[in-house]
């Protein structure tokens, strides 16, 4: 568990999260499909289960984001290269939870975790062209764009 603030907590991804993740994606499918290419391929909870089980077998740590004890999204490392001490951070947040500073605080805390606990030297964040809300996060955190 990584405590981000009094209201925001990151929990390691587990199989117990499958239905929360699927239900959020399914309920917000129209909104999320614009930026998350996997949404249309996620048709059943089994698709989410396959993803979660795959991630749990990799070196890429992923976390659920809880805001005021409610699941609101995912954040985690992707394409981690421990030998060269570099990783990428990816994230998504439920539409209703946006605009509250949840993601920028979560990304900042995950960066701190990557440099401090995981001994990373380089972190990348890739953002879809046109996704200005997502782009503002690495910009505000001082990433080179």
List where the protein language model places each region.
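Conserved GNAT-fold acetyl-CoA-binding loop/helix
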Residues: 31-53
